[in-house]
Amino acid sequence: SDTKNTINWTQFSLQSNSPDKKGIKYSQDAVGKAKGKGAEEWECSFVYPLFDAPIINSFINHFKLHRTRLMIQEPRSVLTYHKDWSQRIHLPIDTNEDCMMLLGNMQAYHLEQGKIYYTDTTKRHTAFNCHNFIRRLHIVGCLPLNTRTWE
C-alpha cells in the first residue's frame, strides 16, 4: 500500500501564542511555520494556557514549558528522523511496550507511562509505535532555549 501521504500522528496544542486565546490554538494549524528565520521566537511564543486544567497547567508551569502539546501517534507508524529547536519534556499518558524513541546516540528507549522524561531533541531522533492497534499518547512540552541540562 502507498503510505507516502499517511498521517502518523496528531497534535493538539495545550498553549496558545496569544493571551486572549485568539492566536494559533493548534500547532497542527501551523505546520511549516516553525522553520527558518524567526522560528525559535515563534515556537517560544506559545506560553498561554488554553484550558482550565490545573494538573496539566501546573506541570507546564513547573518545567517552564512552552508550545506544550498532546501528541498522538498511530499504531504501526514511525515519525520522520528529525531534530527540533528545543529540548523537550515527555509525559507518556498512554503507551505500550512496542513504543520507543530512537535518540541522537542511536539508542532505543521505551518511555514508560506516567514517568517524566527529559529528551534532547535538538539532536536527531524519531519515535516508533510498532503495536498493531494501540495509539501512543504523550504530553510534550518545549523547554526554554537556554536549558542546557536536566534540572
Across the structure, where does each feature detected by a protein language model lie?
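A short glycine-rich, His/Asp/Glu-containing loop-to-beta-strand
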Residues: 55-75
